[in-house]
Amino acid sequence: MPPIPSLWIRVFFSWLLLSLPAAAAADFSHCGGCDDGDGGGGIWSTDNILQCQRVSDFLIAMAYFSIPLELLYFATCSDLFPLKWIVLQFGAFIVLCGLTHLITMFTYEPHSFHVVLALTVAKFLTALVSFATAITLLTLIPQLLRVKVRENFLRIKARELDREVGMMKRQEEASWHVRMLTHEIRKSLDRHTILYTTMVELSKTLELQNCAVWMPSESGSEMILTHQLRQMETEDSNSLSIAMDNPDVLEIKATKDAKVLAADSALGIASRGKLEAGPVAAIRMPMLKASNFKGGTPEVMETSYAILVLVLPEDGSLGWGEEELEIVEVVADQVAVALSHAAVLEESQLIREKLAAQHRDLLRAKHETTMATEARNSFQTAMYDGMRRPMHSILGLVSMMQQENMNPEQRLVMDAIVKTSSVASTLMNDVMQTSTVNREYLSLVRRAFNLHLLVKEAISVVRCLTGCKGIDFEFEVDNSLPERVVGDEKRVFHIVLHMVGTLIQRCNAGCLSLYVNTYNEKEERHNQDWMLRRANFSGSYVCVKFEIRIRESRGNLLSSSSSRRLQGPNSTSSEMGLSFNMCKKIVQMMNGNIWSVSDSKGLGETIMLALQFQLQHVTPVSGASSDLFRSAPIPNFNGLQVILVDSDDTNRAVTHKLLEKLGCLVLSVTSGIQCINSFASAESSFQLVVLDLTMRTMDGFDVALAIRKFRGNCWPPLIVALAASTDDTVRDRCQQAGINGLIQKPVTLAALGDELYRVLQNN
């Protein structure tokens, strides 16, 4: 579509040109024509001229009639609202001009008055419309000039838009290159692969001649060339270095933007080598570590930077523009992120390898510890069995000897031996338990016992110990001591022996004194050592103080320093083998206290023990002895057929004697297989089976199950088991195996008789 001003100029000139022939034709026709003879003959005759004018007027009229149609189409298709009125005026003017020419065709021949009138009216209307159009053009010309100015403005805007579109296209192309480079860079998490991929892809995108990466040295004093795209011709290209205080290095590290290096830059010359090259650009890349990503309190850390150097070819066709530098900056940021991820992965891998090595070391140490623990437990178990079995045999024999007729002095000595053996057996169980589970845990068995008898037995044992050591012994017992109290008899006896053994071990000659009396809370309130923890006893209670004092003669000094107290961590142990810490815990469990007092002259030392006991009133039932080793009547099982199963020869012989003492008919076997074979014979009529649970080849649980299974159709015999421990686990297994009774070792005559009596009564 042609511009608007040129269109109106054409219309204006066509109006001027067409109006002149119409006026001339009208004047010519008004003269009435000329004579045929005046014009001469030929082509320029009057008739030919008139015919030519008539045809011309017709063509002009047709052209004038077609122009308004074009103007009307143009006005409807274009948004020319302010110019539509002038378009209509031009259309009317052109139509009237065409009408004038059309009427003029009829004036070349003789015509009527109506033709002249019509021509006159047409000319008059044409004159009015042309005059109005001329006036309208006077107001339209400034608008046309403004349109021209706007056209120039639009042309300028179009050129600016073209430039912006080109810039957007270049930015889109740069973004595509950046995305492609980022995609290639992030394909790998290896640091060297990332740097090599960066150099290759940047070289393809920016048409580089060379690309190099400079890394800081371990000392941080210089930059070392570590990666380059093309190997230089110099022999020491792999050992090139630049000082860290180089101006270009400092300037590059000071800003995050890319920098174009000067032609004489040492960094640029070292990066391009001996080859001639074009402009050189460089940018920093942060080298982050895994420690930079750890949480917690922020720490001031100096960031380490690498330098990426890019060298263009020498031909001069390429340069470092803003777009190229922007691509380099974005790629450098992406490389920094990828390198940080690679650093995190490398450090994580190193940590993982260290943890794996530590885990292997821990597993090896755990395996060695487990093997050592198993070896220690095996050794302790073997040692415990070697010590426990003879002790159990001795206790069994002593319990049988207690039933013999003896005088009071012999009875006292025998009871002391029984009590001492029982304490030793309990101590072995405690040592085995605490060493196996690696904890200092001991249990108390509170029951009623005779305090007077305990003191007598303790005095008897202490007299024997001091006599063997060559030390004098004296004692004093308060007559106000209650006869029967509730507590752990074995633990109290053991602590007293521990105190005596500790003092005797430190003395070579002197006198040992034992004082037992009741504790008066009102009189001793000022003494902090007497501050006892109040026990939760439902009834009345009594506090008893055991005071053991050693006085050495002046010619002999104590073997240990007088300032050394039992509470110290390096205190010696007693002959019974129990440490003072364990002894103190036992005393605290019994709501008591233990402490020592040394003589200022170093000639004596006193150990005091304060305990609380619950009182038990003496009744006809409770007045009898309830001790484990008592002289009460033993039941008799005359004719009871018993089979004894025990792999230990000594214990089997002692248990055999105990059963015979109870009146049983006993058959002893050494293994569970022999026991099962004994039941296979038709003559077997055993009513009771006494078996040890800890046999070597076949334990007691399997033997009990086999007996129950073998005698399923017949009446099965009663089974009583012998075990070193009677905890809930052992009792549950005995119940599952069909065992009727359980006796804890050491087996004594009284305990064996009571359990057999209970089993026979219940079954």
Swiss-Prot record:
Expressed in anthers and hulls. It comes from the Eukaryota. Binds 1 copper ion per dimer. The keyword Iron does not apply. Its main location: endoplasmic reticulum. Its EC number is 2.7.13.3. The lineage of its organism: Eukaryota, Viridiplantae, Streptophyta, Embryophyta, Tracheophyta. Residues 382-615 form the Histidine kinase domain. Its cofactor is Cu cation. The keyword Cell inner membrane does not apply. It is an enzyme of class 2 (transferase). One of its GO terms (molecular function) is protein histidine kinase activity. Pfam families: ETR1_N, GAF, Response_reg. This is Ethylene receptor 2. It catalyses: ATP + protein L-histidine = ADP + protein N-phospho-L-histidine. Residues 641-760 form the Response regulatory domain. It comes from Oryza sativa subsp. indica (Rice). Cu cation binds at C97, H101. Belongs to the ethylene receptor family. Induction: By ethylene and auxin. Induced by submergence, ethylene and gibberellin. GO terms for cellular component: endoplasmic reticulum membrane. Coiled coil: none annotated.
